[in-house]
Amino acid sequence: MLKGMTRLVSRVHKLDPGRFSHLGTQAPQCPVAHLDNQVPTERTRAISRTLENDPAKHGEQHVGQHYNISIQELKTVFPHGLPPRFVMQVKTFNEACLMVRKPALELLHYLKNTNFAHPAVRYVLYGEKGTGKTLSLCHIIHFCAKQDWLILHIPDAHLWVKNCRDLLQSTYNKQRFDQPLEASIWLKNFKTANERFLSQIKVQDKYVWNKRESTEKGSPLAEVVEQGIMRVRNATDAVGIVLKELKRQSSLGVFRLLVAVDGVNALWGRTTLKREDKSPITPEELALIYNLRKMVKNDWQGGAIVLTVSQTGSLFKPRKAYLPQELLGKEGFDTLDPFIPILVSNYNPKEFEGCIQYYLENNWLQHEKAHTEEGKKELLFLSNRNPGLLERLCAYL
């Protein structure tokens, strides 16, 4: 079995998931829309599961156990931001289950004891590739959504600094560039996750879009969001206005605000984008990045800033880099300092056992030795308890 599984490791990145029926196909924009009429079935609860589905009540006793998020809630809270392979797992198992892990519990403890009269505290999740930073961030987002926070979620900041489909000179500031398609897509997902807030929050300034259209002071923030969705040319400016209004009004105590950015290191460094004369565009010249940088400053109150630094998708960084100072660079590190670093490491023994048991309960491991202690030891050896590698190994067993 060891030789066979070793060969799988070498092939795991070469295999095309689309060729395997149990992995499903690439996720659509709303990853769980096809599950509207499906109800997750109850299974026997074992070591891998907990009946406590409220993140606010998770504690040390739940480490290594999976909790369930209803399909409807998943659609609302996570219209974007879930890892593609996790989306495949949701499709395959017909349920969405997140593992309770120590880094998320540490962060939950901090959030529960936050003094919101003080400036927003920055938390940075970091760790080696595949350790589960994004899913730990999703656990925090789910907690805040259940606590009725407004969620400002940037699922992968790296997508804003490379391979842009449409880049236009900003009408607001000629020194910057708009990304209308990226901005419009983000606004649609922001609306899905926060629709209940948008009619309640009133803009505190008048915003003029063109000679005929404007949003008056006191209008619902929903009007700004709709302007960006319906008039894609105005989407980048609409995002800037939304961020400005949220930052200002959360400080007034109107609502609690979570700023969650996956891959925040993309905000500093280099981009792949170029002007017409082929000269490079820097991140601060992109209006979306310029405005997002303002949101990760701790000069506002009434919320929290939870960030991840990630080598996945990053540009011009060593493949093995994972420490904040390595990925952020001097400018980014100095901008975010002070922050609370939270290491997301490989599974501990309890988490590893919970993951294996979860796969076994769902009949995901078909190899004849997968149920044995010998099989578990070989999976442990081959994966080194790395969550991402373990998931890929198990997908082909």
Curated annotation (Swiss-Prot):
Subcellular location: Mitochondrion
Cleavable signal peptide: none
Transit peptide, residue positions per record: 1-17
Classification via SUPFAM superfamilies: P-loop containing nucleoside triphosphate hydrolases (SSF52540)
Transmembrane segments: none
GO process annotations (BP): apoptotic process; mitochondrial translation
Domain of life, per lineage: Eukaryota
Entry-linked Pfam families: DAP3
Main location: mitochondrion
Top-level EC class: hydrolase
Keywords: Acetylation, Apoptosis, Hydrolase, Mitochondrion, Ribonucleoprotein, Ribosomal protein, Transit peptide
Positions of modified residues (N6-acetyllysine): 174, 206
Function per UniProt: As a component of the mitochondrial small ribosomal subunit, it plays a role in the translation of mitochondrial mRNAs. Involved in mediating interferon-gamma-induced cell death. Displays GTPase activity in vitro.
This protein's name: Small ribosomal subunit protein mS29
Organism whose genome encodes this protein: Bos taurus (Bovine)
GN (gene name): DAP3
